[in-house]
Amino acid sequence: MPLLHQALLDLMSSSGLPESFTIADFGCSSRPHHPLLAVSDMTAFIYKRYHELGRSPPELWVYLNEFPGYDFNTVFKSLPDYLEKLQEEIGSNSFRPLLYISGVPGPCHERLFPSKSLHFVHSSSTLNWLSQVPPELSDRENPLINKRKVFISKTRTPEVIKAYQAQFQSDFASFLESRSEEVVPGGRMVLTLRGRTTPDPAPDKSCLLWDYLGQALQDLVQKGLIEEEKLDTYNIPYYEPYTEEIKAEIEKQGSFTLDHLVINSIPWCEKATTTAQMIGNAATSTTVHEELEIGSLHFGSEIVDSVFQRVSEVIALAADDTKQEQELVCFAVSVTRK
């Protein structure tokens, strides 16, 4: 059984099938083509469970969280189709879902909901994005400027790694602290994020994607499309944590019990037989595209398409040279509010 379903089943079992659920889903924009994918999965599982047990459908209050400025209208326009498919999946016209969905803009590292109002929290990739670039790297007079690099790399200084680690730890602690106020005792959270299985991030595969982006940006500097100074002052507010970092922060914050931490390896491109160019396109279709949207404020929106095209080419060449498909490590973390 998927970890998400197991956590929902445990919640329903421990709470005695309540008449209403409140769910918060963080990071629907990380699924640009299917923003309601996780919500569809969760609500269908809950309603089918109630239907199987002969219980009346519970009221489900679902809050979608995204960064300020995100256009929730795109999601809301898809609701009629989603509700129709949900009814079909339940398989009973007499069992009518009672579902209320709303959008809540705001940073996930801060309080967003009333105290003890959430029964279940789901987060997809949101926690990889830092609230800011580590301050030590954004100060032009500071020697920690990550010159010609956009992220942690093999040639980085130890201080660069420490700066990223400290920022992630601070952000993750703030997320846990905020949710500890909002989640009811016995409530669950399932957090999915990319990570790594080695303590040192520099040689890990988690840096590869950003190394390729850095190479693409350097190529555009050489072509005169990007100013070198802009590249030198550009750092990605993103971090893929080590497993022990996740465990340590959960234990340190103290409000949640760690139930499960599952590690999965996922390919950049689903089929091993795909061409190198397809691998390049697949790898840049999500995370890098999100970063380029942010980077457009730094480099200018007119350069985004050129960067996206070049980084796809760089990844395709790397995939062709290595003759093997690159994989990403993904964590699924399940916790219970004490």
Predicted segments, located by residue:
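Substrate-binding/catalytic lobe of Class I Rossmann-like enzymes that use SAM or dcSAM, i.e.
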Residues: 185-308
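Short catalytic micro-motifs in class I SAM-dependent methyltransferases
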Residues: 125-126, 250
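N-terminal charged/capping segments associated with class I S-adenosyl-L-methionine
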Residues: 1-116, 129-156, 191, 196-197, ...
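A conserved beta-strand element that flanks and buttresses the S-adenosyl-L-methionine
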Residues: 122
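A Trp-anchored, charged/polar loop motif used as the substrate-binding/catalytic surface
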Residues: 1-12, 102-107, 161-178, 241-248
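Amphipathic alpha-helical protein-protein interaction segments
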Residues: 30-31, 35, 97, 106-107, ...
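A short glycine-rich, Lys/Arg-flanked "PGG" loop and its adjoining helix->strand segment in the class I
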Residues: 119, 128, 135-185
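Amphipathic alpha-helical interaction motifs in eukaryotic regulatory proteins
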Residues: 5, 9, 43, 47, ...
